[in-house]
């Protein structure tokens, strides 16, 4: 995955209505893994930048035995799972290894988490009653699904912002194209030019990275 594949979404919160009483599109928790004994959590919600335009962000987390990371001094550290959110742990982790949520003074201002698992629970408990505008940042990737690729926007940080903050759905990525990529067929009639390019995406350990159409 390109290191520049990031997003910044600013707008109103959208929480989808559940399909039925037993299934929520917003938040779910279950036990999975090969023995179905690992606690897992997932959250998904939308950010609307206009009445006709929105995008959904998501995060998945699970319990681990420990967290492996690099501290502020560049040393490799292994943190026991039960110590992941202690003050000592959060002090040694660099910003890019933490998940930050600040929903404002009514919610205790800034909260830091060492794992998605805990951030997800906090968001699920507090976003249900949140009123206002949000800024959500994170990374963007493409996942293969039934022969096609689905855009995924993975949450890193969530902030409450002022109501007059300009809404936007912004992507930042490395975009690759060739001399044949520009389509000017609609330039005169629609005043539009299309660029058919590619983004670099890490697939897996065996495949490595590939260029996918965007």
Describe each PLM feature range.
Residues 1-214:
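OB-fold and OB-like single-stranded nucleic-acid-recognition modules
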């Amino acid at each position: 995955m390109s290191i520049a594949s990031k997003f910044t979404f600013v707008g109103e919160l959208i929480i989808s209505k559940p399909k039925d009483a037993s299934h929520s599109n917003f938040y779910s928790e279950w036990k999975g893994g090969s023995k179905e004994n690992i606690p897992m959590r997932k959250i998904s919600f939308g950010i609307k930048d206009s009445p006709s335009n929105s995008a959904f962000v998501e995060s998945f987390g699970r319990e681990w035995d420990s967290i492996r990371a690099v501290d502020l001094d560049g040393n490799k550290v292994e943190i026991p799972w039960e110590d992941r959110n202690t003050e000592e742990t959060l002090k040694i982790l660099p910003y890019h290894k933490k998940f930050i949520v600040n929903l404002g003074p009514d919610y205790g201002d800034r909260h830091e988490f060492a794992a998605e698992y805990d951030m997800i629970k906090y968001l699920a408990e507090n976003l249900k009653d949140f009123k206002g505008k949000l800024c959500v940042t994170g990374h963007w990737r493409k996942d293969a699904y039934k022969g096609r690729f689905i855009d995924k926007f993975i949450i890193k940080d969530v902030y409450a912002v002022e109501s007059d903050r300009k809404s936007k759905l912004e992507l930042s990525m490395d975009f690759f194209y060739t001399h044949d990529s520009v389509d000017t067929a609609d330039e005169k009639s629609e005043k539009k030019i299309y660029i058919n390019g590619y983004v670099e995406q890490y697939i897996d350990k065996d495949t490595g990275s590939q260029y996918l159409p965007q």
